[in-house]
């Protein structure tokens, strides 16, 4: 669950940039899906249903958190990066080969400052 300032705006970003779909909607809470798979919850920062989340309010939101979304294959990865770019996503690290992880990846930042990495599947070294 990510704490966000504006649930609708954040939900819209994940839908436009990554192709996720809304499964709940609302001003305080959202559930996002990839097809039938539940992948992410958004919760308004100042809503109080989960008071324990407020303990993180002292630090910068997004600090120490990164989300990873793996595409089905390399063409799907490239299409996902272009989709995110077309949706106005901030691409802070262009697509590149990560030799340690053996995949291609790109780094985005969502409207609340969370790091979002999209990557291709693991490619067996030859």
Q: Model-predicted segments: where are they?
A:
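Vicinal oxygen chelate
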Residues: 1-5, 31-34, 54-126
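N-terminal beta-strand motif that seeds the catalytic metal site of vicinal oxygen chelate
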Residues: 1-11, 64-67, 119-126
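Hydrophobic pocket/interface hotspot
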Residues: 10, 14, 77, 84
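A short, acidic/glycine-rich surface segment
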Residues: 48-55, 125-126
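Core segments of cupin and vicinal oxygen chelate
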Residues: 2-49
């Amino acid at each position: 669950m990510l704490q966000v300032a504006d649930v609708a705006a954040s939900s819209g970003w994940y839908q436009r940039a990554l192709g996720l779909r809304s499964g709940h909607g609302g001003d305080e809470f959202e559930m996002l899906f990839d097809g039938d798979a539940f992948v992410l919850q958004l919760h308004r920062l100042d809503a109080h249903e989960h008071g324990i989340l407020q303990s993180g309010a002292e630090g910068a939101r997004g600090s120490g958190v990164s989300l990873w979304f793996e595409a089905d294959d390399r063409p799907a990865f490239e299409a996902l990066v272009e989709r995110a770019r077309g949706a106005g996503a901030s691409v802070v690290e262009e697509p590149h080969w990560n030799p340690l992880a053996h995949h291609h990846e790109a780094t985005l930042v969502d409207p609340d400052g969370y790091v979002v990495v999209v990557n291709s599947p693991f490619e067996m070294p030859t």
